[in-house]
């Protein structure tokens, strides 16, 4: 997508000469905007007949185009929005379409499958309509001015289309993560996890510390992710916050594994899961950090019960860990989306 042409201060680069040409031509034809709207829309369908399928009021209609009761209001809406945003472009320094309308336009265009080439069709139809309406006034400079104004509006809509696309991707990713949680954990895996947990849970205090130390042995920089460690000069084993934190993480991981199949999902209280997602997002946790915790977990359990350990048990605990990790990632994704929305809202200039 081409970026809007902008000046250093962020405003749209639409020249005074271009503005004068657009305003002059719009003043000459706006009293005839009703007929011109219909011509404009008819031209779109002449240039690209398949575009008819993109309009809900046309695609399943057997009524002749000129008799369709919804055609005129829609054509007027599109033509007037395009022309009026062009007239105000330089003065406003941006495309002047109400923000809620722009978001709706983006979502609708994305949903109906509008592509870059469709915007080129509307531009061609717009330029031909204006040229035929005021042939004595038409010039290459005027054509370029209207084309630039059209492209600015098109790019503003494309930005909102991308936002709609990203929101759908985020929603689908979260849904997939949530739907898959617990769905791939077999009865055999459950039995292995329960059996091994029953054998080690009474030693969970020591194992928690071993588990946490392994995380820092495998990935020493991970120390910076923990607020009680990153600025501490106290030896690890003397840190008063280490054991409670290690116990909390280890017990949550193991107990959610034991309950995974029966519950059909990760059984961590929803408020805790949201908090985990927010904290992991804030501290910059990445996928590779979850791989570190998995390795540390598997090594800790293997060393705790070597006589019981097997590839099947390793896979069972690995799967249980991944289910918990995915549940946390889903919450991280939600937090990220909320954060991006807040940043965008704050960065938008007030009207």
Swiss-Prot record:
Instruction: Quote the subunit structure annotation.
Output: Monomer.
Under catalytic activity, the entry for this protein gives: Fe(III)-heme b-[protein] + nitric oxide + H2O = Fe(II)-heme b-[protein] + nitrite + 2 H(+)
EC number(s) reported in the record: 1.7.2.-
What gene is this protein a product of?
Glb1-2
Q: What induces it?
A: Accumulates in roots within 12 hours after inoculation with Sinorhizobium medicae ABS7, at very early stage of nodule formation. Triggered in roots by hypoxia; this induction is enhanced by an nitric oxide (NO) source such as nitrate NO(3)(-), ammonium NH(4)(+) and S-nitrosoglutathione (GSNO). Up-regulated by nitric oxide (NO), particularly during nodulation mediated by Sinorhizobium meliloti inoculation.
Which intervals hold domain Globin? 13-162, 184-333
What's the top EC group for this one? oxidoreductase
State the family it belongs to. Belongs to the plant globin family.
Note accompanying the cofactor annotation: Binds 2 heme groups per subunit.
Give its localization: Cytoplasm; Nucleus
Gene3D superfamilies given in the database record: Globins
* The protein's role, per its UniProt record: Phytoglobin that regulates the fine tuning of nitric oxide (NO) concentration in the cytosol in response to sudden changes in O(2) availability, and performs both symbiotic and nonsymbiotic functions. Exhibits NO dioxygenase activity in the presence of O(2) but nitrite reductase (NiR) activity in the absence of O(2) (e.g. during flooding or in waterlogged soil). May not function as an oxygen storage or transport protein.
Q: What is the official name of this protein in its record?
A: Anaerobic nitrite reductase Glb1-2
